[in-house]
Amino acid sequence: MKITDINVKTFRYESQIVRDDEGHTHPDPDLKEHKVKTTLFSIHTDEGISGYSFGVGKEITENVIAPILIGEDPFYREKLWQKLNHMQRIGQESLNDKVLSNVDLALWDTIGKILKQPINRILGLYRDKVPAYASTMCGDEMNGGLSTPEEYAKFAEWCIKERGYQAFKLHTWYPPIKWAPDPKMDIKACAAVREAVGDDIPLMLDPHHNYSRLDALWIGKELEKLNFHWMEEPMDESSMSSYIWLSD
């Protein structure tokens, strides 16, 4: 089996949310519908089986991805990933980790369809269910949204008591909100949620990689006091030295 073609289709649709340059989703403050777009990335084989994912651009596909994948066996997924990763390392800045991941997903989708098996079975089963947690959008400045710590607390309480979730994760405020990020404001929201849901509910915080080392350290210590389960990506995810520093 060989990969014979790679395609990217662009879809435009109406939405009431906006997405910033780093891919974060925000509610539109005016709640007005506007046109947004996304892409459907597809891998096609000589046996008529195709795999799909989202979010890969047309230019990077035509210039870099297609020349590497076309003619290859999709089962050589690891080899293809290593080739793309090498292209990233030698200066293909638009071939970022998100693009690599989406290409990898399409390859896995292709393999699963060939074998007629779900990917979790191909990778090796361990459990047949996983716990789910409720997760917010980012903070906003909208009435009735997530503009205050109290609104986070109210939403968390609703998710736990009314919807049956057994854990909760906050995404707090960040640009384009002018005053964000603000570590103290984030901790106020975390404290309000903890008070609302009680001591036994696992809580998590995702500060959107917006913080410095010292801010991340301070937030981490405050979250320890609130018995939070984890803090996700407080600093630039590509700065391994920052995470080594924080862990030490």
Model-derived features: positions:
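Metal- or metallocofactor-binding catalytic centers and their adjacent structured scaffolds
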Residues: 44-115
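Glycine-rich, aromatic-flanked loop segments that form ligand/cofactor-binding clefts
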Residues: 104-139, 144
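Ligand-binding pocket scaffold of soluble enzyme catalytic domains
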Residues: 37, 45-52, 114-117, 122, ...
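Structured beta-strand/loop patches that form or line metal/cofactor-binding pockets in enzymes
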Residues: 1-47, 63
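Metal-dependent enolase-superfamily TIM-barrel catalytic cores that perform enediolate-based chemistry
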Residues: 129-245
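Solvent-exposed alpha-helices and their adjacent loops that cap or buttress functional pockets
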Residues: 32-34, 123-126, 195-197, 247
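Conserved, mostly hydrophobic/aromatic
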Residues: 3, 48, 65, 103, ...
